[in-house]
Amino acid sequence: MLEGIRIIEIEGLGPGPFASMMLADLGADVIVVHRHSQPMPGMPERNIIDRGKRSIILNLKEEDDLTNLKKLLQTSDGLIEGFRPGVMERLGIGPEVVLKENPSLVYGRMTGWGQDGPKSKQAGHDLNYIGLSGALWYASPAGQAPFTPPTLVGDIGGGSLYLVAGMLAGLLNAQKTGKGTVVDAAIVDGSAHMMNLLMSTQDAGLLLSLIHI
């Protein structure tokens, strides 16, 4: 379904690579930029998440390699990166630079807390995001500490899936208008959004089967 769509993934952890894996599963041509200091691609922990992707090794602190990445981005439809806010800008490949050179590109950003806000510069983990968003409430028996669910809830549910939705919407918009966009996907925001139905149903007094009631 996404044949002919090229996505560049800057190697990272968890939600970003999982999102690009989903796009590759749908037919997109995903090229992973592996860091020069890391082992060669194909390590066991990445065998699944790198399925269907091509790869290239670049040192983004070297001018020649950075130039090669920019050339790739000029002929691509999308980019996915999961660095902390400001890192891509310091490398010289932030949205303003990249979208100036390729105005139709969809620039996907995967973070825990978003690009701005009081926690944007802080590290975080799945449990932090689902705790502050209210998603951990769902696994809270009355009078007991909440059970810790798998990291699928925040990282994948609130992160990867929302990034994929944003990327697909951005790609459709780019096809119609020729204009790219920045998709700012924050795990805490996605996790909170997933709770809309449960929270509203609980508020209406209709959710009577939660284990914490």
Predicted features and spans:
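Conserved small-residue-rich beta-alpha loop and adjacent elements
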Residues: 1-38
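Acidic, glycine-rich segments within the central catalytic cores of soluble metabolic enzymes
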Residues: 132-211
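Rossmann-fold NAD(P)-binding glycine/threonine-rich loop
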Residues: 93-102, 109-125
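Conserved N-terminal glycine-rich FAD pyrophosphate-binding loop of Rossmann-like flavoproteins
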Residues: 40-50
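A structured beta-alpha segment of the ubiquitous adenosine-cofactor-binding alpha/beta core
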Residues: 49-100
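Active-site loop/turn elements of alpha/beta-hydrolase fold enzymes
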Residues: 35-36, 60, 85, 112
